[in-house]
Amino acid sequence: MSIKEILSNDLKNNYPDGQFTLEQYAAGLEDAIQNGMKIIRSGDALLIYKDISKGVAEAHVINGGVSIIKGINYLFKALMQLREDGYKEVQIPYDKKEFAGILSKLPIFQVTTEKLDGGQGRTYLTKVRLA
């Protein structure tokens, strides 16, 4: 799957109301990368992340619409890469409550989730301990 297809599928699954076009979504991703965010591709998923403190990153998952099992596997591989790079914790904000259940299935990592009131994209926060 191409990056454009990953973005298109994520857009359909997570923003079905048409609030963003594919071009706007891709431009937002490009801007984020130009402003210091980093990207890891794992299969048909992208993990976009930035440092928020020493050894801690904030990450956002862009999923190409794969099955939950494949998605967990892709996310696990990306998190293992961050662990190898020296990160101790990854914080993942999101809106869909179901995502907490997916994250809780990550093998070997300690995962805690809390409800926030931080606006769009920040209803929940899951912290994944990598070390």
What are these regions (language model features)?
Residues 1-27, 130:
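Short amphipathic alpha-helix that is part of the acyltransferase structural core
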Residues 27-45:
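A short helix-loop-beta-strand connector motif used in the catalytic cores of GNAT acetyltransferases and
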Residues 42-47, 57, 123:
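Glycine-rich phosphate/pyrophosphate-binding loop shared by adenosine-nucleotide-utilizing enzymes
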Residues 52-66:
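Conserved acetyl-CoA binding element of GNAT-fold acetyltransferases
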Residues 67-84:
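Conserved acetyl-CoA-binding loop-helix of GNAT-fold acetyltransferases
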Residues 88:
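Short acidic/polar active-site loop segments enriched in Thr and Asp
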Residues 91-104, 115-119:
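Conserved beta-strand-loop-alpha-helix junction that forms the acyl-donor binding cleft
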Residues 109-126:
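Conserved catalytic-core motifs of GNAT/GCN5-like acyltransferases
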